[in-house]
Amino acid sequence: GDVDAAFATADVIHEATYSTHRGQHAHLETHGSIAWVDEHGRLNIRTSSQSPFICRDKIAYLFGLGLPDVRVFCERMGGGFGGKQEVLTEDLVALAAMDTGRPVQWEFTREEQFIGSTYRHPMKVSVKLGATKEGVLTAMQLRIVSNTGAYGNHGGETLYHACSECIGLYRSPNKKIDAFAVYTNTVPSGAIRGYGLTQTVYAVESALDELARALEIDPFELRQKNVVRPGDPMLSLGEEISDAEIGSYGLDECVDLVRAALARGNGVNPPDGEDWLVGSGIAYAMHDAAPPTEHRSNASIELLEDGTYQLVSGTAEFGNGTTTQHIQIAATTLGATANRFHIIQSDTDRTGYDTGAFASTGTFVAGKAVALAAEALRARILGFAAQVMDVEPGMCRMDNDGVICGEGRISLAGLWLASREHGVQLGLSRKAYGSPRSVAFNVHGFHLAVNRVSGEIQILQSVHAADAGTVINPMQLRGQVEGAVAQGVGWALYERIVLDDTGKIVNPAFRNYRIPAYADIPRTEIYFADTHDTIGPLGAKGMGECPINPVAPALANALADATGIRFRDMPFRPDLIYKPIYEKFGAGVA
């Protein structure tokens, strides 16, 4: 489109710049690796990596080794949030192990975690919106400057993602983005939950609220006039057609759920006293279910001698719940209970290739590989059981520990034994890819109170609705949303990295890098849209990253609603927002 012409004829234009700051992953478990050279001369690394195969490839390249000469594997590693994609400890323990011939272990201290790992990219995002007086968007223009630090860790990829869904969520015939990733003499930025989109969603959703107030239109109504609908083309940042699709559309239901919950007002009451100002805010977000690259995953399932199954997946488990979900997917398809499965994961020697556990692909891509393998194995088991029992395949059905064929039945252990006698392999592998990609939707709403004397913010009500397609494990998904809200609240209200004049971090510890404690996090009402995705496994979509994206802008919009002041620079700490509040409500303030 032609944004200049659209702005020239717009009834109203809103233009402002919003800035975001660094955020640490703050996972309790720091980066750590153990390396040793075995009796065959192979380099072995046990590590806390979200991407063991990528780590293996990088280590092999770095030291001039063949891929078969390097094994990388992971056990349960604790939190990652994107940061454990980086090779930060593996290279040095490998060097030391090969040099000394002895096993070497290195685990970051908390200070090393702060100064030696990566952060969320600080960004300055200038947003210009044009609209008719009825609130229909006619032009959207962004200028993004992303601080990638001293090295370009994920600089280009994060910037690419930052540019897409933030404005792809809204219809407008004219869109333009100028985006820059710049090097600075500061700690490197890298991958972290949201992957650039969190920053730009904050800017766009804040700008939309400002536009709504300028037009005197309800913020919900302005968004509803302009959001994408099923059948709309997805925004493509290049010449090619986007492979993203709306596999299910639960945005309207998410909006209705959040709007109704805020209207009910099931939160806590505002504190007593005239110094507390109360406001509400909302924000939307859309997030692709996989990155726009060839993400792929292998999975295999085999029937074992005792009638149990062995499930093998290359993806890593770091608290994202893939172990449980993959077993659930396989168990559902094979008509079995979860305790019939043994799982092997994230080992470059023992599993098929997996690009990595990042970008919400644990369910959408790796889970799809599991589903395909389970479906293929089910078909083979039923066909072989029909052959053994001498019945038509359509007469057979699976249950937890056997196959029922008409009036007869054969146990899974018996079927395994028969497979040995007939030379039939009851184990299959399948691959899945991250294209085409579906999109997930999230809506968040807050009621909050801000003290006009101190600038203190208290969250009175927190509501989140998500379109995750089929919810495979509701408890785990609620945990993902609750964790995302906690991180979003921390990033927006508490956390702040301070650099000295040389770019050195001066607060590399939790005692002076404030993350939210249990008492700081509100109880969040969580709702799921009732949809079935046409692309994901069993109708599911990824929902690991998405819930964090609307949290900060919803807080910013609620703060503006309460005070009548628009704070565009994060974080919204009392010491940083007090002055404008004092200038507006200063009467009677000491």
Over which residues does each language-model region extend?
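Generic long, charged, amphipathic alpha-helical segments
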Residues: 342-345, 516-540
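Short, conserved non-catalytic motifs in the polymerase core
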Residues: 356-358, 362, 535-544
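C-terminal structured "cap/appendage" subdomains that terminate the fold
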Residues: 537-556, 560
